[in-house]
Amino acid sequence: MTQVAKKILVTCALPYANGSIHLGHMLEHIQADVWVRYQRMRGHEVNFICADDAHGTPIMLKAQQLGITPEQMIGEMSQEHQTDFAGFNISYDNYHSTHSDENRELSELIYTRLKENGFIKNRTISQLYDPEKGMFLPDRFVKGTCPKCKSADQYGDNCEVCGATYSPTELIEPKSVVSGATPVMRDSEHFFFDLPSFSEMLQAWTRSGALQEQVANKMQEWFESGLQQWDISRDAPYFGFEIPNAPGKYFYVWLDAPIGYMGSFKNLCDKRGDTTSFDEYWKKDSDAELYHFIGKDIVYFHSLFWPAMLEGSHFRKPTNLFVHGYVTVNGAKMSKSRGTFIKASTWLKHFDADSLRYYYTAKLSSRIDDIDLNLEDFVQRVNADIVNKVVNLASRNAGFINKRFDGVLAAELADPQLYKTFTDAAAVIGEAWESREFGKAIREIMALADVANRYVDEQAPWVVAKQEGRDADLQAICSMGINLFRVLMTYLKPVLPTLSERVEAFLNSELNWDAIEQPLLGHKVNTFKALYNRIDMKQVEALVEASKEEVKAAAAPVTGPLADFPIQETITFDDFAKIDLRVALIENAEFVDGSDKLLRLTLDLGGEKRNVFSGIRSAYPDPQALIGRQTVMVANLAPRKMRFGVSEGMVMAAGPGGKDIFLLSPDDGAKPGQQVK
C-alpha cells in the first residue's frame, strides 16, 4: 500500500574541494543514496543534494602551490567529484559549491539576522601567528596535543580522538603546519557566535528522541562540560566570503559550509523555476523533513552550531542527523603504503559500483559503528549473494522460458502461498530500509533467496524438461522462479541500480515496490542475457597495486610555475622603483656566431638604439620573425661586456627556459620608449 507522500530533503556532508573522493567518502554517499532510492520507491517527494565545501586556507595554499587560482582548482575538483559520484550512481538532484552566489547571500542573511538578534559578539583575541610565513594560522594549520584527552598530533579546531572542539590557542605545544615554526601570539579582533544562549533549546532538541542514542549521549557530555562561544571569523589572507562591514575579516569555513546545504537547494529551486519550495522546506514551521547524513567526526558542528545558527536566524532545524562510523580496510585504517587508501575512480577501473554498494549496505546499521571492507570477504560475499543466490535464480529459469515458451510466463502461480510469503516480507524489509538497518534488510532478502533456490532445487525444472507431457509444469515452475526473482530484485533495487536496470530490461517490466502484489502472469519477458559477472581476487590484487602506484605518483614533487620557481623575498616599493622598464621595438634580430643560445637584438627606444644579447635562440629559431615586434626591456641595467660584444639591457620574457621562453609584449598602441609602470 502506498504511504502518505512526504516532502523530504536529504543531504550528505560536503566533500572538501582539495582532494579526491575515496572509499571512506563513499560509505556515506552510498548509505544516503540507498535510503533516498527507497523513499522514492515508496512515492515520497525527495530532494537529494550535496555540494563541494570550497573555502578555507588549505584550498588557498594548495592553489598557490599548483600555480592556479582557487576558483580554477575548486572548479576542476567539482567536476572530478561529480564524475565519481555519478560513477557510483549516487542519485543527486543537485550538486553545487559553497563558493556560489546563493551561499554568499544566505551566509550574509544568517549572519545579519544573528547579529541583529544579539548573537554575534566582538572581541579582541590573541591568535597564533606564523612568524616565518607572516600569516595568522587557521585552526587546521596548527597541530599539537589535545587539551582535553592529551592525544598528540591533533588539529587546532577539534580532536579526532575524543571529538572535542577548542581554540587553537588551547593546544599544548602547538606547531605551524605550514612552516613547522612555533607560532607566536598576536592580537586580532574576531567575531563570535553566542552558542551558550541556545543551550536550553539544544538540550530539548537532544531529548526529543529523534537523535541516535550515541549522538544524544555525546551531546549530553558537551552540555555538562559547558558550551563556549564559537569563533566564526578569520583574518585575511583567506579564501571565502568577506564578512559584511568588516574589511579583511572572513567567515570561518564552518559557518558557510552547512549553509551550503541551503545554497545547493536554493540553486536547485532556481534551476526548476520553483519560487516556493525553498521557503516551504526551510521556514521555521516547515512540515517537510530534513535529514543530514554525516560522519561521526563532524557531529559537534551539526548537532550544536548548525541547529543553533538556524534557530537564531529563524530557519527550521534538521529533523534528524544520521551519523555513521569510519571505513577500515582489511581490519586497519586505510593505508597508502599498503594500497588500501583507494580512490573512488580507481575502484571503478577494477570493479563495478554495485559491488561496493552491496557490500557496504550489507554491513550498515543505524548505529555509529565503523565498517570494515575486508577485500577477501568482499569477493566471497558478492559472488555468493549477488551471483549465486540472486542472479543465478533468474538464469536457472529464464533459459527454459525463452527456449520452450517463447518468453511467455505461465498464466497462474505454481505456489501462491510461497509467493505471498515473499510479498508479505515487504513490511519487515521496508521497515529495515526506513530505519537504516540495512544489514538486517539484506539478511532478510538473502534468506528469501535461499528459499527461492530451494524451491527450484526441489522442483528440478531440468528434470521436468526431459519428461514428455510436462510442458505446463515446466512453464509454471520456471515462471514461479522468475516471479520470486522479481520480488527479490524489487527489494534490492535501492542498492543495485545498474543490475536493476538490466533486470527490468529482461523482465520487460519496471521494478516497483507496490507492484509486487501482482505477479507477472501471461507476461512476455525478453531474451535472457548475463546479468552479472563473478569477481575474483586477481581484481583485488590489481586494485591494490594500482592504488600503490597512484600514491607513488602523487608523492612526486609538485610541479607548476610557483612550485618550480617560488616567489622571491619581498621587496619594498622603493626597490621596485629603481627598475626602469621600457617599451622597445625589435628593429633587427640575428644569430650570434659562436653561440647556440644567443640572439643579437637591435632595439629602438624611440630615439635611442640599444644592442642586447638574449638567450632566447631555442625558443625563436627564426630571428627574422621577431623583427617589427614590440617587447619590454630593462633599460637601466648596467651594460655587460661579453665576448661577442656589449649587451646594453635585458628583454623581459616568461617561462622556465629552453624552448619554453615567451617574450613579453605590450598591448597595441604602446610606443617605443614608453615607461612600463
Swiss-Prot record:
Motif range ('KMSKS' region): 333-337
Pfam families (alphabetical): Anticodon_3, tRNA-synt_1g, tRNA_bind
Keyword Ligase tagged: yes
Any one GO BP annotation for this protein: methionyl-tRNA aminoacylation
Signal peptide (from-to): none
Cell compartments where the protein resides: Cytoplasm
PROSITE patterns: AA_TRNA_LIGASE_I, TRBD
Residues given in the record as Zn(2+) binding sites: C146, C149, C159, C162
Main location per the UniProt record: cytoplasm
Origin: domain of life: Bacteria
Keywords: Aminoacyl-tRNA synthetase, ATP-binding, Cytoplasm, Ligase, Metal-binding, Nucleotide-binding, Protein biosynthesis, RNA-binding, tRNA-binding, Zinc
GO annotation, cellular component aspect: cytosol
Annotated positions binding ATP: K336
Gene3D superfamilies in the cross-refs: HUPs, Isoleucyl-tRNA Synthetase, Domain 1, Methionyl-tRNA synthetase, Zn-domain, Nucleic acid-binding proteins
Motif 'HIGH' region per UniProt: ranges: 15-25
Coiled-coil boundaries: none
Cofactor binding: number and manner: Binds 1 zinc ion per subunit.
Record function comment: Is required not only for elongation of protein synthesis but also for the initiation of all mRNA translation through initiator tRNA(fMet) aminoacylation.
Similarity comment: family membership: Belongs to the class-I aminoacyl-tRNA synthetase family. MetG type 1 subfamily.
Assembly: Homodimer.
Protein name (record): Methionine--tRNA ligase
